[in-house]
């Protein structure tokens, strides 16, 4: 069973629908015991970094997520969920993140002819491979975001060009992030969720 973490940050119905398409048994939950008992976790999200972290704190889920990862639980952050994986974010001041991947979430700089938010389809460029990134070079996926994850190169798997290399996928150990929306990215996005499913159940078999 996978748990989609519930913290009122939107797009959960689309994520659950996409997981069902790749035959993943999943449900939405904010229950700490269910999160800690899950085979894998998905942290979706749209909205503002500080508001999301405040809601995770209010629900007592920050330490729960950190404990689940420390226990070896695979975690996939999507869009805002990926940004929250970092140490901090600079939206409306500086806020602490989950601290699972080193880095800072920064606003995409204003550039001529490139509106912010970065919205729509963009092509992926491979930087290094991970369990989720096979056959992604040149594939097109759907983005909607105004902030990007500034992470050390060792955690950067895939980028998209938007005047600067925008981190599209990152990972550290069993923690993965997609800045784009796999649930809105057609067959390519479903393929990434399928790979996460395979990774989760390979991980489960080791315990």
Curated annotation (Swiss-Prot):
Keyword Cytoplasm: yes
Disulfide bridge positions per record: none
Organism superkingdom: Bacteria
Compartments where found: Cytoplasm
Classification via SUPFAM superfamilies: Class I glutamine amidotransferase-like
Enzyme Commission number, as recorded: 4.3.2.10, 3.5.1.2
Keyword presence, DNA damage: no
Residue stretches making up the Glutamine amidotransferase type-1 domain: 1-206
Catalytic activity: 5-[(5-phospho-1-deoxy-D-ribulos-1-ylimino)methylamino]-1-(5-phospho-beta-D-ribosyl)imidazole-4-carboxamide + L-glutamine = D-erythro-1-(imidazol-4-yl)glycerol 3-phosphate + 5-amino-1-(5-phospho-beta-D-ribosyl)imidazole-4-carboxamide + L-glutamate + H(+); L-glutamine + H2O = L-glutamate + NH4(+)
InterPro entries documented for this protein: Class_I_gatase-like (IPR029062), GATASE (IPR017926), Imidazole-glycPsynth_HisH (IPR010139)
Pathway: Amino-acid biosynthesis; L-histidine biosynthesis; L-histidine from 5-phospho-alpha-D-ribose 1-diphosphate: step 5/9
Residues making up the signal peptide according to the UniProt record: none
Xref: Pfam families: GATase
GO MF: glutaminase activity; imidazoleglycerol-phosphate synthase activity; lyase activity
Main location: cytoplasm
Sorted UniProt keywords: Amino-acid biosynthesis, Cytoplasm, Glutamine amidotransferase, Histidine biosynthesis, Hydrolase, Lyase
Gene Ontology biological-process entries: L-histidine biosynthetic process
Active site: 79, 181, 183
GO annotations of cellular component type: cytoplasm
UniProt cross-references to NCBIfam families, sorted A to Z: IMP_synth_hisH
Summary of subunit composition and partner proteins: Heterodimer of HisH and HisF.
Function (record text): IGPS catalyzes the conversion of PRFAR and glutamine to IGP, AICAR and glutamate. The HisH subunit catalyzes the hydrolysis of glutamine to glutamate and ammonia as part of the synthesis of IGP and AICAR. The resulting ammonia molecule is channeled to the active site of HisF.
Name of the protein described by the UniProt record: Imidazole glycerol phosphate synthase subunit HisH
Source species: Streptococcus sanguinis (strain SK36)
């Amino acid at each position: 069973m996978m748990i989609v973490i519930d913290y009122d940050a939107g797009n959960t119905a689309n994520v659950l629908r996409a997981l069902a398409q790749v035959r993943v048994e999943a449900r939405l939950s904010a229950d700490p015991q269910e999160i800690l008992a899950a085979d894998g976790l998905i942290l979706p999200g749209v909205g503002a970094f500080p508001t999301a972290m405040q809601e995770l704190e209010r629900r007592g889920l920050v330490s729960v997520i950190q404990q689940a990862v420390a226990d070896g639980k695979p975690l996939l952050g999507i869009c805002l969920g990926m940004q929250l994986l970092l140490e901090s974010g600079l939206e409306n001041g500086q806020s602490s993140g989950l601290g699972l991947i080193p880095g800072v979430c920064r606003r995409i700089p204003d550039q001529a002819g490139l509106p912010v938010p970065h919205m729509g389809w963009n092509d992926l460029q491979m930087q290094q491979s991970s369990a989720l990134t096979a056959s992604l070079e040149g594939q097109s996926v759907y983005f909607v975001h105004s902030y990007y994850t500034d992470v050390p190169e060792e955690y950067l798997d895939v980028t998209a060009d938007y005047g600067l290399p925008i981190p599209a996928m990152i990972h550290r150990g069993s923690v993965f992030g997609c800045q784009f929306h796999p649930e809105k990215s057609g067959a390519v996005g479903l393929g990434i969720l399928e790979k996460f499913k395979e990774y989760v159940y390979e991980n489960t078999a080791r315990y």
